[in-house]
Regions:
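Conserved alpha/beta-domain cores
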Residues: 1-185
């Protein structure tokens, strides 16, 4: 199935209001251009250098989302253009994103990465670490980042029930912190 046919099929199955982030890492520009031709405008990359090269050569109305583990020393390269960072896994990284976003007069939306998997190779805050970071309140002073939600990577297993439990725990945690730290009262 072609990229265009596959993308049209996936998009037809999405509920209204859901936006698709097409993972484009390791794919050549030609593949992204094919997806772009049928209307895909949001692409996800996990390597800063590859994302920057694609940003420089592809249409400027593309929204670039960073979806991989991010080192603090790489933030400065993407701060001028990244639309969202999906993997904030430490307060130190959040502070660095704020610093680099401030330099380019931007507010960068970010997702807190929560470690929900049974694998040590995955990154992210534990539930307790995230609560502690939010409790300290320092994040409220970071004016150039916007905490927009949470994300997690489930364990890489064939057990659908385990995967479901892990994502259910993430959903429960999201509802908890949304109520405790982000509710408008």
């Amino acid at each position: 199935m072609s990229i265009q046919a596959n993308l049209k099929e996936v998009l037809s199955e999405l509920p209204t209001g859901v936006r698709l982030v097409a993972v484009s890492k390791f794919h050549p520009n030609e593949a992204l251009e094919e997806a772009y031709a049928v209307g895909q405008r949001i692409f996800g990359e996990s390597h800063v250098q590859e994302m920057t090269q694609k940003y420089e050569t592809l249409p400027k109305d593309i929204e670039w989302h960073f979806i991989g583990h991010l080192q603090t020393n790489k933030v400065k390269y993407m701060a001028p253009y990244v639309a969202m960072i999906h993997a904030i896994d430490s307060y130190k990284l959040l502070v660095e994103v704020n610093k680099q976003a401030s330099k380019v007069h931007r507010v960068i939306p970010c997702l807190l990465q929560i470690h929900i998997a049974q694998e040590e190779t995955k990154f992210g805050f534990s539930f307790d670490e995230c609560r502690e970071m939010l409790d300290t309140g320092g994040w409220k002073d970071l004016k150039n980042v916007r905490l927009s939600g949470v994300m997690g990577m489930a364990t890489n297993v064939d057990d659908d029930e385990q995967i479901k439990r892990e994502f259910c725990s993430l959903n429960t945690f999201f509802k908890e912190i949304k109520q405790s730290y982000f509710s408008v009262s």
